[in-house]
Amino acid sequence: MQNKRRFLWQALLMTGVSMLLRSVGVSAQVIIASRIGAEAVGVSSLISGVGGFAITLALSGIQLGCTRLVSEGLGKQDAPFIHRTLQCAIAHALVFGLFSCLMLFFGAPLIGRFWLRDLRTLPSLRIMAVTLPFISLASCLSGYFVAVRRVYKSAGIQVLEEILRIGCTLFLLNRMASHGLESALLALALSSAIADIFSGCALFWLYRDDRRRHFSIPAANATLPTYRSVGRKLLAITLPVAIAAYARSGLITLEHMLIPLGLQRFGHSHSDSLASYGTVHSMALPVVLFPGALLGAFAGLLIPEITEAHVRDEHTRIRYMMGRVFSLTLLYAIGVSGIMIAFSYELGTTLYDSREAAEYIRLLAPLIPIMYLDSATDAMLKGMGEQVYSMKVNIIDASISVLSVWLLIPSFGVMGYIITIYVTELLNAALSIVRLLNISHLRPMIMRWVATPLLSVVAATSLTRLLYVLIPASLAPVGHRGAIVVLVVFSVLLYGLFSVLLGAVRQEQIRWIGSFFMGK
């Protein structure tokens, strides 16, 4: 019970932090978009695409590797193994981080000239390169804190990092954005660099303090595993993840380069292409993915829990956890999807004053259950040691995505990109879920997990819409934004009520959740 309650409190902490950071991030994105315009947002997204590949190279699967091996050492109560694992993991992070830094720094002119086709991106790329070793080290140490179940330390640094990033962004944009697009991009890059360097240094300091408090340094005559043996175990985890990440990130970067080019072939101007790309990728998608922060925290914490159960061959416990994850993820995601579809126009026009953004939110919202469930499934597969399979699925996903973008966008414009997102998300989720069900022998309950929540959210949003049409004057005193909040909250309450009445939420589930708090 102590482990169960510890998992709950850590999950609640990470959920709160994730929701806070995602809320602040979306709010900041709204402000930034209003300051620099859709074209600059599009160029920034292209830079982020290249930076994303560089970060992937710097990380090379180290967070998962550190989490899994430290969790394995804790499960076996093997302190010398943990000590050697951490030495190898930090070395891994620094080597790959420095290599990625040099590649991006010296390759920036070629990337800016021939890939992004915009030399205004060069300073931003070089600033981003300097931060890569710090990002890699921070990822490694975050994996350590997840494994030892002290995520509140890394969570606190994440909050401070985001506050620093946004504060610097707003400060620098006020002074630099008026000098043109290049200066605005430079302000964004400098802000991120300051925050990333702070995060890496702060996490390393916390790690040193945590090691001193909780893990004694092995004596000089203690028998330690060799660097070679631990390094091989670490690479056996990180390399499959890294190779998949390289391929997927490289293909995604290529995909993001092809999208504006495809829109130009469809008939858009260069500026309009960047603006349309920015509207979908940096405005609509963040809103759709925002509620996923609530589940993302749980998914990350599942890896060490499932890893320890897998090492101990506790198959019944694994199936029990997986059943709970599937049930609660779909209950939450279907509700979010239905409410977002029902109020997409209000969300788009309120956040961005853009009907185009509202339309893209409506089109992408039906994918929310697939996206969120795929994320949770991926975490459970990694906990079961199935990272090689995940690698194959991710490469297939990214390859089909690039091919679809190349073929569809010149003919269908932005709708071609929407179709691409649907095809790849459905394929990735299907392959991952089928694999997890096969290896865990878990039996899905379609009626309870899917049909009942779907019926509940349709009833809840329809009734809310009907009441709003019948008595719109009752919401006039709270204003337009306040009315949207009231409508969404009312829909959530009705969804919860219908879910209980129709059996999507059962007494056994309520007792299970209550047991975390009551200690029974």
Segments and roles (model prediction):
Residues 1-24, 80, 84, 221-248, ...:
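N-terminal membrane topogenesis motif
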Residues 6-67, 94, 101, 105, ...:
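Signature of the first transmembrane helix
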Residues 32-53, 181, 185-186, 229-237, ...:
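Interfacial/gating helices of multi-pass transporter permease domains
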Residues 60-75, 288-313, 319-322:
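Helix-loop junctions and terminal segments of transmembrane helices
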Residues 109-128, 340-371:
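Interfacial segments at transmembrane-helix termini and the short loops linking adjacent helices
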Residues 135-157, 366-396, 407:
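Membrane-interface junctions at transmembrane-helix termini in multi-pass inner-membrane proteins
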Residues 157-171, 179-212, 396-400, 414-435, ...:
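Hydrophobic alpha-helical transmembrane segments
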Residues 466-520:
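Membrane-proximal transmembrane or re-entrant/amphipathic helices at the cytosolic face
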